[in-house]
């Protein structure tokens, strides 16, 4: 009941009189000889308008309105664009010594500043978390790949809400915020949750949440928080083009609504991460360009770097990796295959450069190019993950399988660079990407942690085309941009005090070539590989996958005399090494780096919280007419275990099409009806099998695939119709276990096809009849639940 104030010593009033007198108290009413009675006016808050700073009466005339002013950025605030590449080495763009045509990136450097000693966390998710938060990756729970939570604080995989992102900070300052492309900072890609981009400060997001996807057939694109309803991509579709097309569309939308509002655009290209796939027109530019081989191309890049002044005089080119054969020792047929891999890589980077040119042209046309801060960089260096021969079917690694023989890749050479393969280039080309440094992605040597870094702001940075040799790290990007844009750091985030930023602004270095580096030390850790940099010295410890961690195998390098980190000085300076090793240990404890984990890819990639693992025996029913069921839901139901999949449907005369499909070109299975009969194609990550089933009668039907996991990744299956013929057992090896991007489709095979030939005949091959449901019944795991690759 609402309480009403009454005057002191007032007579007792009946309810109606109380109401009358209360109303009267709100208006001038001389009583008692002209003196106003001591009534207390009820405030807006007491009437149910808490926090409203205006006044509310019973009528408009008695009230005072109030309008909240929207947050506006300061007048003249710059636009901010970050173009982030994926798995691109220090030496891959033209302005860092490459032969690849990157005129738009080179122009960015010509009107900006290049850094020669910028470093990163050497793997995807940690580098992105550090970039977006200005904090060390482990300290924001992202010391490893986001989708592989091992259960320790530095590795949970989701950026905590008390670590505000640059998007959240800029939006609070009045910026429009946009992200396109790759996210890879959420553990849960299935359901909308507070780790998705639009929950972490972005007004608009168009892209994918996971670590990689195909370029011709991306899996599960999100438009903000909604799965884009894409069954098939149009002819000529290519993801890198699509990301920029949407970015330009978002920017145009912003300008149509508000011509002056500054924007922050995060272009997170998945190029040049595998699978290496490129458009034919771009591939054609590079045919024959890499026939000279990786030794010659690497030497030429090194010479250009020296001539540019990026690499100091007297620097040694790091020795060739012992795992990389000399090019002239590679058989001629393999040379052609290996060159094709690098042609594809170059074409992909060329395409990304073209799209940067489209963005620059738009900003130039709008008259906003001069007042736009551009940052261009990569998450980490080039990768050696595919080994000396590369891999056409690299997804086998994610499925805990050994690579296929190079002879098979030779037979399928025409697939390299197309949507049919999931290729990654050979280690020799990764060493070219990382010229002049040794080491690769996931390792803390120079090749993994040192990447190109360009900052451009024509309106304010006068030293165009210059090179800065001051040390910098990825966590410095956010504070630098906030400093340049004069945007304050957030004190609170999602109702909590914000974690302090660990990055330092590089603004002084950008404005003055002689300014000291604001940062003089930094730790690095990835997959138990460690490094520590301090005042020109760096200690590095690299590990062998799956072996006991060696805590004493550190090497020591002096940056002033050894830019390429190719000379080990640990014996000459044992005290300096001990100092850096101790500093790493202190930083590791302070940033939640421990425990170190050096398990194999199979063990790490396939681990997850126990509550996400289905029971040993489980049954799931799935309904048609819905979006693709996420692979994280489907894969555990069939991973290296017995299972039965049953599709119930009504079949009419002449009906045909896909009943269900799991997976994509990388691996999976598709059950379909063609020429009146039940058929199955099984894509065992480059090993293909087919089962022919019985003819399908008209009427209500129930078709089943029965699968047995036999151990050592072998399996067999058979097709059956309820009440009808049961097919013969046929080999379906290897067992499926991750490695594909798509989940379960019912009634069609969306986007990337499991069976390429079937797709060429029929496209997505939508079933013409009526499907009731699909049931997956999981059985026991394989007898040994072994990993073929340890």
Which residues does each PLM region occupy?
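Intrinsically disordered, low-complexity regions enriched in serine, threonine, proline
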Residues: 17-18, 44, 57, 610, ...
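Formylglycine-dependent sulfatase
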Residues: 22-550, 554, 563-582, 596, ...
């Amino acid at each position: 009941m609402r309480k009403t104030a009454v005057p002191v010593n007032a007579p007792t009033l009946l309810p109606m009189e109380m109401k009358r007198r209360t109303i009267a108290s709100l208006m001038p009413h001389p009583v008692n000889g002209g003196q106003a009675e001591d009534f207390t006016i009820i405030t807006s808050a007491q009437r149910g308008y808490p926090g409203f700073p205006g006044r509310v009466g019973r009528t408009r005339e008695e009230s005072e309105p109030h309008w909240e002013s929207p947050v506006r950025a300061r007048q003249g605030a710059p636009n901010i664009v970050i173009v982030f590449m994926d798995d691109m080495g220090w030496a891959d763009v033209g302005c860092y010594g490459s032969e690849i045509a990157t005129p738009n990136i080179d122009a960015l450097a010509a009107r900006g500043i290049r850094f020669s000693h910028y470093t990163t966390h050497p793997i995807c998710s940690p580098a992105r978390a550090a970039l977006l938060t200005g904090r060390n990756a482990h300290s924001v729970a992202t010391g490893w790949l986001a989708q592989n939570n091992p259960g320790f604080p530095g590795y949970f995989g989701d950026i905590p809400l008390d670590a505000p992102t640059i998007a959240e900070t800029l939006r609070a300052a009045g910026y429009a915020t946009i992200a396109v492309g790759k996210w890879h900072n959420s553990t849960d890609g299935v359901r909308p949750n507070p780790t998705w981009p639009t929950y972490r400060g972005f007004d608009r997001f168009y892209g994918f949440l996971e670590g990689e996807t195909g370029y011709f057939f991306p899996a599960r694109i999100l438009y903000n928080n909604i799965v884009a309803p894409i069954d098939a991509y149009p002819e000529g579709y290519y993801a890198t083009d699509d990301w920029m097309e949407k970015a330009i569309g978002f920017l145009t939308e912003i300008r149509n609504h508000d011509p002056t509002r500054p924007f922050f655009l995060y272009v997170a290209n998945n190029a040049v991460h595998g699978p290496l796939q490129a458009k034919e027109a771009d591939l054609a530019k590079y045919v024959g360009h890499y026939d000279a081989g990786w030794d010659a191309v690497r030497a030429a890049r090194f010479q250009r770097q020296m001539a540019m002044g990026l690499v100091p005089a007297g620097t040694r080119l790091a020795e060739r990796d012992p795992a990389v054969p000399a090019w002239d020792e590679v058989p001629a047929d393999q040379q052609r295959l290996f060159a094709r891999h690098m042609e594809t890589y170059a074409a992909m980077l060329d395409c990304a450069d073209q799209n940067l040119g489209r963005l620059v042209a738009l900003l130039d046309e709008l008259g906003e190019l001069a007042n736009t801060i551009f940052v261009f960089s990569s998450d980490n260096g080039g990768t050696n993950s595919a080994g000396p021969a590369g891999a056409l079917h690299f997804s086998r690694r994610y499925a805990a399988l050994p690579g296929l023989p190079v002879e098979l890749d030779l037979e399928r050479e025409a697939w390299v660079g197309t949507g049919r393969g999931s290729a990654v280039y050979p280690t020799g080309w990764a060493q070219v990407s990382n010229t002049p440094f040794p080491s690769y992605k996931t390792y803390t040597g120079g090749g993994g942690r040192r990447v190109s870094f360009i900052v451009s702001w024509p309106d304010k940075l006068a030293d165009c085309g210059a090179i800065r040799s001051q040390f910098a790290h990825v966590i410095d990007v956010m504070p630098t941009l906030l400093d340049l844009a004069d945007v304050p750091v957030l004190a609170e985030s999602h109702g909590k005090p914000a974690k302090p930023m660990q990055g330092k602004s590089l603004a002084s270095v950008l404005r003055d070539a002689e300014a000291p580096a604001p940062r003089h030390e930094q730790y690095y850790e990835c997959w138990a590989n460690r490094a520590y940099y301090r005042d020109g010295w760096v200690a590095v410890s690299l590990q062998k996958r799956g072996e006991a961690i060696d805590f004493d195998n550190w090497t020591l390098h002096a940056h002033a005399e050894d830019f390429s980190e190719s000379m080990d000085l640990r014996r000459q300076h044992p005290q300096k090494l001990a100092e850096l090793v101790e500093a790493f240990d202190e930083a590791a404890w302070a940033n939640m780096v421990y425990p170190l984990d050096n398990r194999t890819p199979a063990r790490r990639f396939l681990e997850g919280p126990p509550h996400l693992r289905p029971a040993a025996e489980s049954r799931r029913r799935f309904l048609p007419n819905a979006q693709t069921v996420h692979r994280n839901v489907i894969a555990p139901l069939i991973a290296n275990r017995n299972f039965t999949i049953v599709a119930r449907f009504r079949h009419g005369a002449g009906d045909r099409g896909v009943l269900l499909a799991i997976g994509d070109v990388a691996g999976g299975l598709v059950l379909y009806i063609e020429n009146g009969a039940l058929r199955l194609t099984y894509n065992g990550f480059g090993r293909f099998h087919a089962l022919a089933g019985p003819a399908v009668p008209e009427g209500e039907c129930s078709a089943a695939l029965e699968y047995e996991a036999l151990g050592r990744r072998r399996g067999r299956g058979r097709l059956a119709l309820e009440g009808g013929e049961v097919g013969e057992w046929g080999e379906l090896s290897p067992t499926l276990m991750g490695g594909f991007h798509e989940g379960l489709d019912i009634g069609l095979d969306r986007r990337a096809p499991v069976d390429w030939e079937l797709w060429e005949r029929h496209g997505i091959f939508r079933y013409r009849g009526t499907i009731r449901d699909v049931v997956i019944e999981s059985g026991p795991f394989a007898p040994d639940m072994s990993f073929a690759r340890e």
